[in-house]
Amino acid sequence: MTHADLSEARTTVRWWDRGRRVDPRYLIAFLITLVLVVAQLRYHVVGGYDRLALALITCMATEALLSWFDRGKVVNLQSAYISGISLTLLVKPQGGALWPFALGAFLAIASKYVLRYRDNHLWNPTNFAIVALLLAAPNRVSVLSHQWGNDLATNLVIWTFGLVIAARVKVLHMTLTYVASFLVLNALRAVALGQPVMPELAPITGPMYQLFIFFMITDPRTVVRQRKWQYVVVVIIALTEALLRVASDQGWPLPIAFNAAPALAALWLVGPVAKWIDLRRSGQRTPAQAPLPGAPATMPQADRGSAQAAGAGR
């Protein structure tokens, strides 16, 4: 091996080591930003930069004010940043209204400080806000569904970065468990109904599901802590979603939110119950989360918790 080859190999190793030392929270923020940029450049799904500005400003201002009031200091605002982008992408109001972005942003962040058990919030903030909006104003608010299409190049970029970052943040097992559960359950549902299988599986490549599997069900602050129970809870969420879809197929009188976004509704129903049981069993009285590798060990717990988001979506 020549001197040039050795030098190139050392450079590659140095860059790899630097990448491994990057705080995972910045990787998550990068991924949601990538989703936003790709979605806007390719499909113009934002619908107006005033929506993005309003959601981001409201999320970050609410986080700053409530954290200062609750903890005496302004915490890291990365979680608010991720929530603001997720809301901008997912919320689709009628008539170009802006109020759902302001209200949704406030509800998302406020839920972290109000809906708590033993100093831990129970809902993924973005998930809570979107389902709350759909329940309160189903005729005024909808969610992003198929507006991206299933373009191979777009999905390849997002899924490649998403899977790599999920592996780096040590939540890949949750993402893959949900995807596998979704594929199996929806294939069985299609067979039972005598429908083609592929149309029932296609939604997993849509934008809402990409935000859901990379940011919401993997949120470190709202998932249960033991790995074996993480598998169990993710499967239960997928089962609940499948049951909501079956109920919708049968014409049961479900809330519009459950028909419009069964995955979000399933997490909204199952996630906080699982987290509450986890906290109650452990006797945890301080903010708890699934550990993320790479976070500085000396970082104050409050800052570290508020900065992390695994969820449109946080």
What do the predicted segments below correspond to?
Residues R42, A136-L188, G194-Q195:
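Internal active-site segments that recognize and position negatively charged phosphoryl groups
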Residues T12-R14, M60-G72, L107-H121, T160-K170, ...:
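C-terminal ends of transmembrane helices
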Residues E8-L31, L185-P300, A310, R314:
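C-terminal transmembrane helix-loop-helix hairpin of multi-pass membrane proteins
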Residues A80-P93, N127-V141, L156-W159, V179-A190, ...:
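Small-residue-rich segments of transmembrane alpha-helices in multi-pass membrane proteins
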Residues Y43-T58, L90-G104, R140-L156, V197-Q210:
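Structural signature of hydrophobic alpha-helical transmembrane segments
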Residues M1-W68:
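N-terminal signal-anchor module of multipass membrane proteins
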Residues R51-E63, S79-T88, P100, G104-A108, ...:
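Alpha-helical transmembrane segments in multi-pass membrane proteins
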Residues G72-G149:
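Membrane-interface helix-loop-helix junctions at boundaries between adjacent transmembrane segments
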